[in-house]
């Protein structure tokens, strides 16, 4: 719609870029109320010139969406869809319109990192700094180890 095009332009994105960000955000979180924040985090990374480093793109590149734990080795797989290795936005899947709208209207924030919560609720901890992120990641890795998730 015209509204979505204007909102995408306000974010410095093409409409198709918003669709791609939305598709990654949907795969990243099963919690619809979190997807706008996740999408905005990826937009922050794009604007900062960072790689997205989005776990769903690794699952897509490997061809296995049942993976529960992304390893460092997995992030090195050679694929144009792997955003740990490649800059920019790859296609993943067609997102819901609501996710697109949630991203376009999400509150601006300074988050650059996220990690699944260690309580396995499906929600994420968000961080503005890499140091904060590492602390959250350690909690999550410890919880995975405690449950024997490889």
Language model: regions and residue ranges:
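Bacterial extracytoplasmic/cell-wall-associated proteins, especially those involved in peptidoglycan
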Residues: 1-150
């Amino acid at each position: 719609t015209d509204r979505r095009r204007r909102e995408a332009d306000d974010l410095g994105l093409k409409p198709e870029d918003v669709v791609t960000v939305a598709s990654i955000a949907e795969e990243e979180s099963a919690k619809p109320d979190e997807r706008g924040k996740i999408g905005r985090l990826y937009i922050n990374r794009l604007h900062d010139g960072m790689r997205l480093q989005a776990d769903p793109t690794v699952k897509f590149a490997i061809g296995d969406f049942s993976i529960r734990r992304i390893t460092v080795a997995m992030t090195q797989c050679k694929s144009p869809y792997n955003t740990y290795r490649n800059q920019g936005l790859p296609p993943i899947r067609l997102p819901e319109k609501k996710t697109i709208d949630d991203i376009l209207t999400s509150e601006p924030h300074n988050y650059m990192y996220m990690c699944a919560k260690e309580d396995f609720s499906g929600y994420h901890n968000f961080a503005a700094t890499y140091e904060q992120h590492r602390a959250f990641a350690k909690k999550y890795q410890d919880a995975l180890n405690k449950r024997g998730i490889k």
